[in-house]
């Protein structure tokens, strides 16, 4: 074992704790490690996932036994849930850290960050490069607006300047993919002014493209996806349109649009395709 390495794995909750433990054993075996430093209960996205985890004789009781045996260090949870459920899970006081989504283009989990900080929890940001806007393949407009930094560097530094955030997840298909993130880390102490300038530039570009009246009101009074005919996720569709209009984030918007209707509780609701068949505009 490498003392400089912190090893994390994720196991989803299960209605049958014995199945949860089997998956935990499988993960441990594949990692070929004597101890898991961090275990995340993966995907507390719905109230029933939380219940499976924390109820008496639930999945967390298995974890506590493993912790007592010295096989697991800290336990957290990962989530794509709405912010109220994230906060409810945080405030159980049963978890040491949380893996969630929060980055420049998506900050609606701000209240969850506040709750995690108040409960002295670690915060791990999920996929800030990919889910933060396909920053590995940025638009020319985004590249220009983020200059002299690359959009990946800007987003990394935007997140890490917030003292409530401790870790960013980084995917790499080749070792060189890590270089730009290491470059961002090397600039943490010198780029505060640049980050502020880029942030203002991005916001100004969005106001220029969309207008102040739209940007200050677009998300007010919108129905939830499960309150809408065809389960169309109107808030997400409008958000994606904002990203497209403001910063030319076409590849990301298309990817997220295509996932709606196929993402289940990880990315709930449907896109607007059903307007062409089963749902009328009058509905």
Predicted regions and their residues:
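Glycine/proline-rich, positively charged
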Residues: 13-111, 117-125, 129, 147
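Structured C-terminal cap/extension of enzyme domains
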Residues: 111-283
